[in-house]
Amino acid sequence: MPQHDQLHRYLFENFAVRGELVTVSETLQQILENHDYPQPVKNVLAELLVATSLLTATLKFDGDITVQLQGDGPMNLAVINGNNNQQMRGVARVQGEIPENADLKTLVGNGYVVITITPSEGERYQGVVGLEGDTLAACLEDYFMRSEQLPTRLFIRTGDVDGKPAAGGMLLQVMPAQNAQQDDFDHLATLTETIKTEELLTLPANEVLWRLYHEEEVTVYDPQDVEFKCTCSRERCADALKTLPDEEVDSILAEDGEIDMHCDYCGNHYLFNAMDIAEIRNNASPADPQVH
């Protein structure tokens, strides 16, 4: 069995092409467990998770990437956020009936993919591509060609392992400032495209790479763990409350006796009573009771 929830980087010695392979199981399950999503929505989030992991691994700096789908369809938002430590979280918003076998365009409708790159230091960058491809992978390949001018291919697979959702993917990309031959890149892409879902999700990464590229010279680097991690906190909720008009906060307190702030990503609840609100307004740090 493979070591799930790991990302592997690799490099072709005879071509100016690099690759990545990722599989996720536990991380995906944690993203899905607090929600009752229809299966097509689960599949999209699985693909987004794989894609975000692969894209985050292309960063040459500390920071994070958010990949989101937006549109006017029954799933009007799906988003995964990840950082250079491969810490991921995600959520989707459903506002209508989801057909059982809905494809990406049926789910999102008229929409687009937004990729937001936020370095720990430096300026934020945002790229937008229309949802013109039939798959998420095709849309992201289009993004790379438009924004990075780097030939890039993504191969994403979703399925189940031992009855639990899992997903995996591979990325091939021409090295920046290198003169890779198109024929060489196409050859490697053709090999990669033959990967079967079962192989990618159930075989160790090194065996997958050997099956695909055993006639090539490939250097495989140490893997990086992928994990679910939410960045919500009581302090962030308190900061958000500071931005609301006092009369709105007081109205909620008068009606409900407390304010319940819920994180859509992880399901945590943060409760604030009148005393907490008074402390927030006095710039004090409220106590940290938290309901899971």
UniProtKB/Swiss-Prot annotation:
Record keywords: Chaperone, Cytoplasm, Disulfide bond, Redox-active center, Stress response, Zinc
UniProt modification remark: Under oxidizing conditions two disulfide bonds are formed involving the reactive cysteines. Under reducing conditions zinc is bound to the reactive cysteines and the protein is inactive.
Localization of this protein: Cytoplasm
Gene Ontology, cellular component aspect: cytoplasm; cytosol
Tagged with keyword Chaperone: yes
Tree of life domain: Bacteria
HAMAP family: HslO
Protein name (database record): 33 kDa chaperonin
Taxonomic lineage of the native organism: Bacteria, Pseudomonadati, Pseudomonadota, Gammaproteobacteria, Enterobacterales
Gene this protein is translated from: hslO
